[in-house]
């Protein structure tokens, strides 16, 4: 079984800022509690591997979860956060006021997304599918956590 786990609450979430791949964005205290809860829930699943995005907030989530699962995590660039281009570190409200709902535009393949340097849905889909294929081939019949 492949379990996708989003990183726990991070500083940018509480500030309503789109962090993208920005380094140095850490979990909040609440985020650390959330990661602990996730780790406790995963304890019973006999997790054999944890792969994580290389961004700080995902690594911090993985560090906490991995202690509960007794498995060391490995970083993998195929799980990295969406590259948000020019929208990186912008407040959500400003993005929506100037560009509308960029998330819907991302999924629909709008050219406005790529024109602003945002990674396309197809690009994200390709790298995540590569990761899933890797996990299926390497961890047959095992429980694996992918932290994004």
Where do the PLM segments sit?
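Short, basic/glycine-rich phosphate-binding loops at helix/coil junctions
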Residues: 15-18, 101-115
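Extreme N-terminal starter segment of soluble prokaryotic enzymes
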Residues: 1-3, 49
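Loop-to-helix element that buttresses phosphate recognition and phosphoryl-transfer chemistry
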Residues: 9-60, 115-129
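Generic enzyme active-site microenvironment
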Residues: 5, 76, 147
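Phosphate-coordination/substrate-recognition cap region in phosphate-metabolizing enzymes
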Residues: 37-103
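Active-site-adjacent alpha-helix immediately C-terminal to a catalytic or transition-state-stabilizing loop
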Residues: 11-12, 59, 67, 129-148
């Amino acid at each position: 079984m492949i379990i996708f786990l989003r990183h726990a609450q991070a500083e940018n979430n509480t500030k309503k800022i789109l962090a993208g791949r920005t380094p140095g964005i850490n979990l909040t205290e609440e985020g650390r509690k959330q990661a602990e809860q996730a780790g406790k829930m995963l304890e019973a699943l006999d997790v054999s591997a944890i792969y994580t995005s290389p961004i700080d907030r995902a690594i911090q989530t993985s560090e906490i979860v991995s202690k509960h699962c007794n498995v060391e995590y490995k970083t993998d660039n195929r799980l990295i956060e969406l590259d948000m281009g020019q929208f990186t570190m912008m407040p959500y409200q400003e993005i929506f006021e100037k560009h509308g709902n960029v998330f819907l535009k991302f999924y629909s393949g709008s050219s406005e997304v790529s024109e602003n340097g945002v990674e396309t849905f197809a690009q994200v889909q390709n790298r995540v599918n590569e990761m899933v294929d890797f996990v299926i081939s390497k961890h047959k019949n095992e429980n694996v956590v992918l932290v994004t």
